[in-house]
From Swiss-Prot:
This is 1-deoxy-D-xylulose 5-phosphate reductoisomerase. It comes from Oleidesulfovibrio alaskensis (strain ATCC BAA-1058 / DSM 17464 / G20) (Desulfovibrio alaskensis). Catalyzes the NADPH-dependent rearrangement and reduction of 1-deoxy-D-xylulose-5-phosphate (DXP) to 2-C-methyl-D-erythritol 4-phosphate (MEP). Pathway: Isoprenoid biosynthesis; isopentenyl diphosphate biosynthesis via DXP pathway; isopentenyl diphosphate from 1-deoxy-D-xylulose 5-phosphate: step 1/6. SUPFAM superfamilies: 1-deoxy-D-xylulose-5-phosphate reductoisomerase, C-terminal domain, Glyceraldehyde-3-phosphate dehydrogenase-like, C-terminal domain, NAD(P)-binding Rossmann-fold domains. The gene is dxr.
């Protein structure tokens, strides 16, 4: 696909089975779904490494089931606990910290690296995989939000490939197959609208953590569930689309589609639109990437159009859910603003989950952090990992200070 962020995997990789997998974030929602995909067709895959952040017991159970030679945990203090939970006679090499994740991402024997860490924490490992020329099944959208230009450059230097796991971008990727991207008129990202679609400001002022986590269609982790409720998830996906498909911002649109059956669409210059439809289950997109170009059995029930009945669409309410527009402004503004947007959002979401701020404070904090960044002098292009993560760290501190001042 011309203009795509990376070369596609070559013929040798396409035919390589069983395929050696490194799963970064194996204990999260995407990681556990990926292992369910592997379970159905174990002859096609070999688990080489598993990495988890906090759920050491689940990581130990996964490791006992697949016996990979490498494991990783973020917290070095958890390594001994993990080792103690493993079956007798099984002694994998246990890596720790971000360095451990980066080591796994670049393992010479790895055919495919699933980047499924949550948030900016996934950047270093994604970049390490790109530097090593790996095929990356990318679920960590923040890597592109923070460093899309850097990852594009690395992929074209090393031959690394990116296959998008996000359901929307996986849909677009599929809709572009066999077509010239130059003939694409626009990308249409669909959004469920989240749990608060149709609610008014009065209701949003007092929503609880539990209400915000209750997504109507998808089973997801806490952070992405809140991002869906604020529409920030869709804002991040707009930025992701621009990087993945080299699309101008004005060619990426968002439409609310409450049923989450159409996962996204591509419109071509002849007026036609190609949509990807399916049951809202992440195993479909995960299997598409892990098994590329083979279409695999996933265990997902096929879509029954008669049961679905009707599909509806509406415009997003930007006045109630300004995060979508903040993301557009961040991408258009450049100069590190996408990094600020993401870092401020991660801090604000965490504060909301702790009960420290209200739901409507999330976009207010993000906007305040972006304004503070705009007001400061800058001498950095934020196009390398260290400068990006320095800005990320600074923004987290500024956002926490802003939240304290508001409190």
């Amino acid at each position: 696909m011309n203009g795509y962020i990376s070369p596609l995997p070559d013929a040798a990789w396409n035919s390589r089975f069983p395929r050696s997998l490194v799963l970064l974030g194996s204990t999260g929602s995407i990681g556990t779904s990926a292992l369910r995909v592997v379970e159905r067709q174990p002859e096609l895959f070999r688990i080489t490494a598993l990495a988890g952040a906090r759920n050491v017991r689940l990581l130990a159970r996964q490791a006992a089931a697949y016996r990979p030679p490498h494991l990783a945990v973020i917290n070095g203090n958890a390594a001994d606990e993990l080792a103690s939970l493993l079956p007798a006679g099984y002694r994998p090499r246990i890596h720790t910290g971000q360095e451990g994740y980066e080591f796994l991402a670049a393992l010479p024997e790895a055919d495919c690296v699933l980047s499924a860490q949550v948030g900016a924490a996934g950047l270093r490992a994604t970049v390490a995989a790109a530097r090593a020329g790996k095929t990356i099944a990318l679920a960590n959208k923040e890597s592109l939000v923070l460093a899309g230009g850097l990852i594009r450059r690395l992929c074209h230097e090393t031959g690394a490939s990116v296959l998008p796991v996000d359901s929307e971008h996986n849909a677009i990727f599929q809709a572009l197959q066999g077509h010239d991207a130059a003939q694409m008129r626009r990308i249409i990202l669909t959004a469920s609208g989240g749990p608060f679609r149709g609610r008014d400001r009065t209701f949003l002022q007092s929503v609880t953590r539990e209400q915000a986590l209750n997504h109507p269609n998808w089973s997801m982790g806490a952070k992405i569930s809140i991002d869906s409720a604020t529409l920030m998830n869709k804002g991040l996906e707009v930025i992701e689309a621009c990087h993945l498909y080299n699309a101008p911002l004005e060619k990426v649109e968002v439409v609310v589609h409450p049923q989450s059956i159409i996962h996204s669409l591509v419109e071509y210059n002849d007026g036609s639109q190609i949509a990807h439809m399916g049951t809202p289950d992440m195993r479909i997109a995960i299997a598409y990437c892990l098994g590329w170009p083979r279409v695999m059995h996933t265990g997902v029930e096929p879509l029954d159009l008669l049961s679905v009945g009707s599909l509806t669409f509406e415009s997003p309410d930007i006045s109630l859910f300004p995060c979508l527009e903040l993301a557009r402004k961040a991408y258009a503004g450049g100069n590190g603003l996408p990094v600020v947007l993401n870092a401020a959002n991660e801090v604000a979401v965490d504060l909301f989950l702790q009960g420290a701020i209200a739901f409507l404070d999330i976009p207010r904090l993000i906007e305040a952090a972006m304004q503070a960044h705009d007001a400061a002098p800058h001498q950095n292009m934020y196009d390398e990992v260290e400068s990006i993560l320095t800005l990320d760290k600074t923004t987290r501190r500024v956002t926490a200070d802003l939240a304290g001042a508001r409190g």
